[in-house]
Design a protein with these regions (language model features):
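Detector for outer-membrane/organellar transmembrane beta-barrel domains
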Residues: 195, 201, 209, 265-373
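Residues that define the transmembrane beta-barrel architecture of outer-membrane proteins
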Residues: 39-41, 68-76, 120-130, 144, ...
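Transmembrane beta-strands of outer-membrane beta-barrel pores
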Residues: 47-57, 82, 99-109, 124-126, ...
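Short glycine/proline- and aromatic-enriched beta-strand/turn motifs that initiate or cap beta-hairpins
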Residues: 26-84, 108-110, 288-306, 430-432
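Outer-membrane beta-barrel "beta-signal"
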Residues: 189-207, 417-432
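Repeated loop/turn-to-beta-strand initiation elements of outer-membrane beta-barrel proteins
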Residues: 83-93, 138-146, 202-206, 320-326, ...
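Membrane-embedded beta-strand positions of outer-membrane beta-barrel proteins
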Residues: 43-47, 93-99, 146-152, 194, ...
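Outer-membrane beta-barrel translocator domains and adjoining extracellular loop/strand segments
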Residues: 54-64, 104-118, 158-175, 209, ...
């Protein structure tokens, strides 16, 4: 199994390199000193469906409880996202709140010196969760920065559980086990990291809009990268005046844009540009390279409860054309824990394809290897995890969106992750 996994990874890496080398359609060369600004506050509300697998284990010297579940949930979602990417800092803030019905099925084991219970169970109830995150990269010159990042989340589940299985007591007597109970779970986690880094990922959203409009509506004229950049700055000036609380008028903004095209670039206004202006609202897409390192910690109110260590992360993004973006990242963490230390790495490569200014297709692959260092009989053993993924995002109009994600976790021994698919659909309204 391990030989097959390694062979698969090697083959995939070779294929990725071949494809990447052949991507000669990349048209732009952005200088390190060239900085694009991006400021946006987005408020979303709608419905979010999620289905996936989860597990939990608690051990003491005399007792062990283990549970695996495949769950689904449909929740009302409220989300607030804020980006403030300037020349001297890059900030991001996210807040998310969800609540709705929860259902699922799985199995659990409750083992002690008194009895061992193994049962299948079904659950139905309510799931609520909230999360908040903040990250700030402060640039004390054009290339070097310091990082502060903190994340936190909490989840409360309340549900009915129907269990059916067998119980084996200390005398090896086996009896049937059937139980209906009301259960609740409260889980929360906090993690933070500080870091130092070099490089910058430039937000390319406004450049993408400028690139697309000029190339598609004025194809008879050749535009230099400098021409597109000037138009990019004007698009940013218009969009950065928005207020998410009061909203904005796309017809007024579109008129400002077309006036710039006419007065500054001597182009004839096109009436259909207003429809294009209503879309083009994607999550930040980037170009550039960045490497950072530093300490981190993570606290979770179940085992493993407190982890600390250090990390090294490299990010690369390439704006190829208005339609294509390529993304690559490689990171490694040293995780220290009271019972066992381990090294965990992650390699990720993916592509994004943008259909006009309305839709986005994502696809890619993550490889997650891990090695236990001490405290285990499996010291030095390599464990592998694989996560292929696809995604689709579309803007139905200036305010309505659909976001679909599908991934599959693949693990040979399930020490790093629980194998199985993850699927989510969000249908929501947006104000920005």
């Amino acid at each position: 199994m391990k030989k097959n996994a390694v062979a698969f990874v090697v083959s995939l890496v070779v294929l990725i390199l071949i494809i990447s080398v052949q991507e000669s359609f990349a048209q732009y060369d952005f200088k390190n000193s060239e900085i694009f600004l991006f400021q946006k506050n987005e408020i979303d509300w709608g419905l979010h469906y999620y289905s996936g697998s989860e597990r939990e284990e608690t051990r003491t010297e005399t007792w062990r409880e283990y549970e695996e579940l495949t769950t689904g949930a449909v929740k009302f979602q409220f989300k607030n996202q804020f980006w403030n990417f300037l020349d001297y800092k890059q900030e991001r803030f996210d807040f998310n709140l969800e609540a709705g019905p929860l259902w699922g099925n799985g199995n659990w084991v409750d083992s002690s010196s008194v009895a061992n219970i193994e049962a299948d169970h079904n659950i139905f109830g309510l799931r609520t969760n909230a999360s908040v995150s903040y990250a700030s990269r402060y640039y004390y010159n054009n290339k070097n920065y310091t990082l502060v990042q903190i994340n936190g989340w909490a989840r409360y589940d309340f549900y009915n559980q129907n269990s059916n299985g067998i119980s084996t007591d200390s005398n090896e007597v086996v009896t049937g086990f059937e139980e209906t109970t009301k259960e609740d779970k409260f889980r929360y986690s906090v993690d933070a990291r500080a870091g130092w880094g070099m490089g910058r990922l430039k937000p390319m959203n406004h450049f993408m809009v400028a690139d697309y409009i000029l190339k598609n509506y004025y194809s008879e004229r050749n535009f230099s990268q400098a021409d597109i950049t000037k138009f990019t700055n004007e698009i940013g000036r218009i969009k950065h005046q928005r207020d998410a609380r009061s909203g904005h008028k796309t017809d007024v903004e579109s008129a400002q844009m077309q006036e710039y095209l006419n007065q500054k670039m001597f182009l004839i206004p096109v009436s259909s540009l207003e429809e294009e202006w209503k879309t083009g609202e994607f999550l930040p897409r980037f170009d550039g390279n960045r490497v950072e390192f530093g300490p981190f910690f993570k606290y979770y109110n179940r085992e493993p409860d407190f982890i600390y260590g250090g990390y090294l992360l490299f990010d690369h993004a390439k704006y190829c054309t208005a339609r294509w973006n390529r993304n690559f990242s490689a990171g490694i963490n040293y995780n220290a824990y009271k019972k066992q230390d381990w090294i965990l790495a992650e390699l990720s490569i993916g592509w994004s394809y943008f259909l006009k200014l309305r839709s986005q297709f994502d696809f890619g692959f993550k490889y997650v290897p891990g090695i236990a260092i001490n405290g285990s009989g499996n010291d030095g053993e390599l464990n592998n995890g694989f996560i292929p993924y696809v995604g689709y995002f579309t803007q139905i109009n200036s305010k309505s969106r659909v976001d679909i994600k599908l991934s599959c976790r693949i693990s040979e021994d399930e020490k790093l992750m629980l194998s199985g698919p993850e699927f989510s659909v969000s249908v929501y309204r947006s104000r920005y």
